[in-house]
């Protein structure tokens, strides 16, 4: 083998032996062939799926933003003179969030939700957090996943507003009913985030001189923590990660209750929040060392 031919000389000579009409680069592509038509249909299907995914991501972002605004509104209850006005306004905001979820349900009509779950999971978790926060303020209890899903049944008659009477799958096809089911993982992650909002509500209540709310929140968080402890590391990875944050929130609430119970009689109410915040910083430092 000469130096000019190099290591690829044999391959080049072998390629030159092919007739010109059999070379790949010289062959015209028939755009109307069955293979090309099949791949064009695949391209259209993938483009439509990607476009749908992007629309769902935008809707999920809107759901997240509106749900956060509802949570911020509900935090004003600790200092507002009339709680009913804020609850009414929060219900209006949640109705707006459900209108966005109705659009998601329409986008997912006839589709496998699990293929697009990653696009909407953030918004659903934030919605669960907002609606469960409102439910706790009203009833001092935890809303169930079934109750949340019942609120996510929509019909064309009321233009997407919640339907109080759940319908069967046959009725869904007959009357044009859409529904979106919150998955157990979305529900658990939303409830885990709820504990952080309850911790903030507890600290704000202490600062406003409310000595009942911290103990109610503390008892509720203990029950939630016990429930998550049963799941432990056997559940989804995201749930086990939230367990540490939940434990921190519970410790801060219990510390606020300690400040109220032990030192409440000797410290003015307007200073209790400062005492609890100092204790909270000490807890964070100890957990960081450990």
Curated annotation (Swiss-Prot):
Protein name (record): Translin-associated protein X
UniProt keyword list: Cytoplasm, Developmental protein, Differentiation, DNA-binding, Golgi apparatus, Isopeptide bond, Magnesium, Metal-binding, Nucleus, Spermatogenesis, Ubl conjugation
Function: Acts in combination with TSN as an endonuclease involved in the activation of the RNA-induced silencing complex (RISC). Possible role in spermatogenesis.
Native source organism of the sequence: Macaca fascicularis (Crab-eating macaque)
InterPro entries: Translin_C, Translin_fam, Translin_N, Translin_sf
Compositional bias annotation for Basic and acidic residues: 16-28
An example Gene Ontology CC term for this record: Golgi apparatus
Gene symbol of the encoding locus: TSNAX
Family: Belongs to the translin family.
Main subcellular location: cytoplasm
């Amino acid at each position: 083998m000469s130096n000019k031919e190099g290591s690829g000389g044999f391959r080049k000579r072998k390629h030159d032996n092919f007739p010109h009409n059999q070379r790949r680069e010289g062959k015209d592509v028939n755009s109307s062939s069955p293979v090309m038509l099949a791949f064009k249909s695949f391209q259209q299907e993938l483009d439509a799926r990607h476009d749908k995914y992007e629309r769902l991501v935008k809707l999920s972002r809107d759901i997240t933003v509106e749900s956060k605004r509802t949570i911020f509104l509900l935090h004003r209850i600790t200092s507002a003179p009339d709680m009913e006005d804020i609850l009414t306004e929060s219900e209006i905001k949640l109705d707006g969030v459900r209108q966005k979820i109705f659009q998601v349900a329409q986008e997912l009509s006839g589709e496998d939700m699990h293929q697009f779950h990653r696009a909407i999971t953030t918004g659903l978790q934030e919605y669960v957090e907002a609606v469960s926060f409102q439910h706790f303020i009203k009833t001092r209890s935890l809303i169930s996943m079934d109750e949340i899903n019942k609120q996510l049944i929509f019909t064309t008659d009321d233009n997407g507003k919640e339907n109080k009477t759940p319908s069967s799958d046959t009725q869904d096809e007959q009357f044009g009913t859409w529904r979106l089911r919150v998955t157990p993982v979305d529900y658990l992650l939303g409830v885990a985030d709820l504990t952080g909002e309850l911790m903030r509500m507890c600290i704000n209540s202490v600062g406003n001189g409310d000595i009942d709310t911290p103990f109610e929140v503390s008892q509720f968080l203990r029950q939630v923590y016990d429930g998550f402890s049963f799941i432990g590391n056997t559940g989804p990875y995201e749930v086990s990660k939230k367990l540490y944050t939940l434990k921190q929130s519970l410790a801060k609430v219990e510390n606020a209750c300690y400040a109220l119970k032990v030192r409440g009689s000797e410290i003015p109410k307007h200073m209790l929040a400062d005492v609890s915040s100092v204790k909270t910083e000490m807890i964070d430092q100890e957990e960081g060392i450990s």
